């Protein structure tokens, strides 16, 4: 199922050398620029409520951890192997690692200055403060000593390091205390390590601990590692605690699976998850006050390069700040909103009846994800439904979708589910659901060898008037109601016969030995996504030569594929107007005269994570629009099962066109990519347009997306 096309999009006219490294942005540095934009949301004092700014610091920090676990780990492997191959922009692995360290160091400084210098004082003004244990009264310290003894002490494990005790294993993402001790009996110095338990909250809320009295109702917060460090004498009696120094470890967490050699994929992935714990250390976070002797000891025994040691003056592991979102201070958070539910409002909740009447397109989170959940629930209960087939990639830990599928099996339906076990960092969760589905009798498969199944597909077969009718859900996002509240994605419900035939054939390929490749409407990776996208770009060039008004609009999470970028450069050189909405990585450089001067790239970072993918071509006035799961990256085009599906109804095409135009008009949350590869906030003289806020306003007015007014395109 590989796309072996050898597109020659450069042959039509004489053009610059599109392999020139200056025409591309480094993938890793582009990702870091994206994470910088996430950090900027925390830095912006007037654009988010206070706790939401803290949330962005947490997201930035969590993103960066994952970046090191996967991308930096891969570069480290190349560097250690002496690889000198250059990236798309001409950099060696060593040069990329140097740039990453330089950028991350600067970002840490920005993040900590924002949190400690700006956000913490603002929290204090709202009655929330991080406090110093040493400032407490003796009576409060006594209460906390008892609290430590009963609630913290039992789950701590002090680990010594000496000739009789090997250096303790330090797990990935763990926060630890490196402790200097003096053995008073033998008058010698000792070293020990205590892991800060991840099973406990990282941030203690002192206002929730009985017996403490501070004389007011302020919310006082204490870092758990700080709290533990003040009670270490309970762990090491007859020892003098010299000092405790926090440190944090990030390990290589990529799982390499030789699927051709795997007897049982599920067991192989379980083994991979276990081995992930022992990946090499790719980042060591320490505080500046850690003595050189302890730092060198950690570097030696963790086998980490000194270039991968980062000094962080404040608390380590700020991804844990997400815990503060539990604080009940509505005035410090985004206002809640109720998404519209067009099916419920228009068809009284009978989803099959609604789909028979017309196709339905939902734009989450502004439109509720509940109709998708209701579709599976209704199918599970409906005696006329014979079978349900579905792909699952990331479904969450408490999934109503999976519960509905299990209920459908119990109701006698034939249920076939492709559970993608290789969904990174969701492997364990997906294994649990795969086994649960198997245990109730569902047909569970794990996909195709060598490919991740990332497509979002559901097919329901129902008996109607002595005939079988198929109903489809096709989406751009996961079957996860929790993320559907914070990710922007499309859901498409249809009973279109041609699409149903295509989806049926695709499920046969996924679950059986079908080698069907001739899909009539769907674009499927790794068969032909790159080929079809490039063909539509080339077609737009031909239309532009005839009519002079070629237009391409693409919205995606990442644009990395060199062949597609070259095709877009060719379109720009031919005069086609190209607008790209790329949330994250973008290796294409806009604004280069004679190459990309007709290309505009924006990235929208706001309250919701922009996750939908849309590919629009004017096509000489015969608009063509595809939605789906695929970004324009080699992994999506060559190594995953992805689906792009056409929107065939002209009214729904106009809906998406208007939404794309609104996003392109954003001058509040949009960042524009410059010709040097940097990003700057969109600044113009128009009235302020925050596209996500406009969509929220429309949802609050109970407007269906089918009523959105077309503006432009």
Curated annotation (Swiss-Prot):
Record InterPro entries: PP_kinase (IPR003414), PP_kinase_C_1 (IPR041108), PP_kinase_middle (IPR024953), PP_kinase_middle_dom_sf (IPR036830), PPK_C_dom2 (IPR025200), PPK_N_dom (IPR025198), PPK_N_dom_sf (IPR036832)
GO BP terms in the entry: polyphosphate biosynthetic process
Regions that span the bilayer: none
A GO MF label: ATP binding
Record keyword Ion transport present: no
Sites where the protein binds Mg(2+): 394, 424
Cofactor: Mg(2+)
Residues spanning the signal sequence: none
EC code: 2.7.4.1
Binding site for ATP: 63, 487, 583, 611
PTM annotation: An intermediate of this reaction is the autophosphorylated ppk in which a phosphate is covalently linked to a histidine residue through a N-P bond.
Active site: 454
Catalytic activity: [phosphate](n) + ATP = [phosphate](n+1) + ADP
UniProt keywords, alphabetically: ATP-binding, Kinase, Magnesium, Metal-binding, Nucleotide-binding, Phosphoprotein, Transferase
GO cellular component, one term: polyphosphate kinase complex
Main enzyme class: transferase
Pfam hit, one: PP_kinase_N
HAMAP family reported for this sequence: Polyphosphate_kinase
Family of the protein in this entry: Belongs to the polyphosphate kinase 1 (PPK1) family.
Entry protein name: Polyphosphate kinase
Gene: ppk
């Amino acid at each position: 199922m590989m796309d072996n096309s050898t597109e020659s999009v450069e042959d039509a006219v004489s053009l610059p050398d599109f392999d020139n490294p200056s025409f591309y942005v480094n993938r890793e540095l582009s990702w870091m620029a994206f994470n910088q934009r996430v950090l900027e949301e925390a830095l912006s004092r007037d654009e988010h409520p206070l706790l939401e700014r803290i949330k962005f610091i947490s997201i930035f920090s969590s993103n960066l951890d994952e970046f090191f676990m996967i991308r930096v780990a891969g570069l480290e492997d190349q560097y250690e192997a002496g690889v000198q191959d250059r990236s798309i922009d001409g950099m060696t692995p060593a040069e990329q690692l140097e740039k990453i360290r330089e950028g991350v160091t600067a970002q840490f400084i920005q993040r900590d200055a924002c949190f400690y210098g700006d956000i913490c004082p603002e929290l204090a003004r709202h009655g929330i403060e991080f406090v110093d244990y040493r400032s407490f009264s003796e009576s409060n310290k006594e209460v906390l000593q008892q609290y430590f003894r009963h609630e913290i002490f039992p789950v701590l494990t002090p680990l010594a390091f000496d000739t009789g005790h090997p250096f303790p294993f330090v797990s990935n993402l763990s926060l630890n205390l490196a402790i200097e001790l003096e053995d008073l009996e033998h008058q010698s110095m000792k070293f020990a390590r205590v892991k800060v338990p991840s099973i406990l909250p990282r941030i203690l809320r002192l206002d929730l601990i009985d017996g403490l009295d501070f004389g007011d109702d302020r919310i006082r917060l204490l870092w758990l590692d700080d709290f533990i460090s003040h009670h270490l004498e309970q762990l090491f009696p007859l020892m003098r605690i010299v000092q405790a120094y926090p440190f944090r470890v990030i390990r290589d967490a990529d799982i390499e699976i030789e699927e051709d050699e795997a007897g049982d994929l599920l067991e192989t992935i379980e083994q991979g998850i276990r081995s992930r714990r022992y990946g090499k250390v790719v980042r060591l976070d320490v505080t500046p006050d850690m003595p050189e002797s302890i730092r060198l000891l950690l570097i030696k025994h963790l086998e980490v390069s000194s270039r991968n040691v980062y000094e962080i003056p404040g608390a380590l592991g700020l991804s844990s700040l997400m815990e503060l979102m539990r604080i009940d201070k509505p005035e410090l958070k985004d206002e809640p909103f109720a998404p519209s539910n067009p099916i419920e409002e228009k068809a009284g909740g009978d989803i099959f009846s609604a789909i028979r009447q017309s196709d339905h397109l939902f734009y989450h989170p502004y439109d509720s994800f509940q109709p998708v959940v209701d579709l599976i629930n209704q199918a599970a209960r409906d005696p006329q439904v014979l079978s349900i087939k579905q792909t699952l990639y990331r479904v969450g830990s408490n999934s109503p979708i999976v519960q509905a599928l299990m209920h459908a099996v119990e109701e006698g339906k034939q249920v076939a589910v492709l559970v993608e076990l290789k969904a990174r960092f969701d492997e364990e969760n997906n294994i649990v659901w795969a086994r649960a589905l198997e245990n109730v009798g569902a047909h569970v498969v794990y996909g195709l060898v060598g490919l991740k199944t990332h497509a979002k597909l559901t097919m329901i077969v129902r008996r109607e008037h002595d005939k079988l009718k198929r109903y489809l859900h096709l989406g751009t996002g996961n079957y996860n109601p929790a993320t559907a509240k914070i990710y922007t994605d499309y859901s498409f419900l249809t009973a279109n016969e041609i699409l149903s035939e295509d989806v049926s054939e695709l499920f046969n390929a996924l679950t059986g030995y079908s080698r069907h490749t001739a899909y009539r409407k769907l674009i499927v990776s790794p068969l032909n996504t790159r080929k079809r996208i490039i063909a539509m770009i080339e077609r737009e060039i031909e239309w532009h030569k005839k009519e002079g008004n070629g237009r391409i609009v693409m919205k995606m999470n990442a644009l990395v594929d060199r062949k597609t970028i070259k095709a877009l450069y060719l379109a720009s050189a031919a005069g086609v107007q190209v607008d790209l909405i790329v949330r994250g990585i973008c290796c294409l450089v806009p604004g280069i005269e004679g190459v990309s001067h007709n290309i505009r790239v924006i990235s929208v970072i706001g309250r919701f994570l922009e996750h939908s993918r849309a590919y629009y071509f004017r096509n000489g006035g015969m608009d063509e629009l595809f939605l789906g799961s695929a970004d324009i990256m080699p992994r999506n085009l060559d190594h995953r099962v992805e689906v792009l599906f056409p929107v065939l109804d002209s009214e729904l095409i106009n809906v998406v066109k208007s939404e794309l135009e609104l996003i392109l008009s954003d001058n509040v949350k949009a960042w524009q990519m410059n010709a040097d590869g940097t990003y700057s906030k969109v600044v113009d003289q128009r009235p302020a347009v925050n596209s996500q806020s406009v969509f929220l306003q429309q949802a609050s007015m109970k407007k269906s997306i089918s009523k959105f007014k077309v503006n432009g395109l």
